[in-house]
């Protein structure tokens, strides 16, 4: 039985200046309610909006907030891998910094982690544009086909993973494929993976970059590189 004693909450920043303060405040509130040892890790992935500078100011207000910087934009996967190198606690909650996901889902993720090493999420209803829903559907269909997966949705930005798993699996992807890579390698290595349903919310500030043409190409590249290695 897994007992969650301490949690590291991590989110990357890229063009998320408008939400970093809100995400930090929500995260602190939820983690305090859980009454467990915690830290918040923010990784500025070369953000052009000085989001990291704002995050640094937030870290002065909250001692449990730690901020790390990339000098240039290295990619979503690279930002998460930096967080994986820096976190200190037993479990890590990965969530995007754009406020599309609800930090309160952490309560359910902690509960769902009993007897599992990784808990991924699927979206009950995707409140996105038709094109983004179509891209997500095609992406998940390809993943299920070539990797023989049974997960409903492997492309969400909300996951809860044990330190044991993170430290034993080497992740290579710098693209948004990193989340799928984590789940695929966890299954192949014999770790127990569960999934729960969550609600997502429309982005209220800025525009996301995960479904940009560049990121789609990089994701496909990382996907087929992994497929060629297994």
Regions found by a protein language model. Give the residues of each.
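Acceptor/aglycone-binding surface of glycosyltransferases and processive sugar-polymer synthases
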Residues: 68-86, 91, 103-176, 201-221, ...
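A short, conserved alpha-helix in the catalytic core of glycosyltransferases
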Residues: 165-169, 175-192
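Short beta-strand/loop segment that forms part of the nucleotide-sugar
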Residues: 36-47, 68-70
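A conserved acidic beta->alpha catalytic loop
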Residues: 44-52, 99
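Short, well-formed alpha-helical segments that are part of the catalytic scaffolds
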Residues: 16-31
């Amino acid at each position: 039985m897994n007992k969650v004693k301490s949690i590291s909450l991590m989110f990357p920043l890229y063009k998320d200046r408008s939400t970093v303060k809100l995400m930090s405040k929500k995260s602190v509130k939820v983690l305090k309610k859980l009454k467990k040892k915690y830290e918040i890790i923010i990784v500025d992935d070369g953000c052009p909006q000085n989001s990291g500078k704002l995050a640094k100011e937030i870290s002065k207000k909250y001692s449990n907030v730690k901020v790390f910087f990339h000098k240039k934009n290295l990619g979503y996967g690279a930002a998460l891998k930096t967080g994986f190198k820096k976190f200190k606690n037993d479990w890590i909650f990965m969530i995007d910094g754009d406020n599309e996901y609800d930090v309160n889902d952490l309560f359910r993720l902690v509960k769902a982690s009993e007897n599992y090493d990784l808990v991924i999420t699927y979206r009950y209803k995707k409140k996105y544009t038709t094109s983004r829903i179509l891209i997500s559907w095609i992406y998940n269909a390809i993943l299920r086909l070539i990797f023989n997966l049974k997960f409903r949705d492997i492309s969400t930005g909300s996951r809860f993973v044990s330190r044991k798993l993170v430290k034993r699996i080497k992740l290579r992807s710098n693209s948004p494929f990193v989340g799928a890579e984590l789940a695929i390698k966890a299954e192949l290595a014999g770790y127990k993976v569960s999934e729960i349903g969550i609600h997502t919310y429309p982005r209220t500030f800025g525009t996301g970059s995960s479904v940009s043409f560049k990121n789609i190409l990089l994701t496909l590249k990382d996907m087929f590189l992994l497929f060629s290695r297994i």
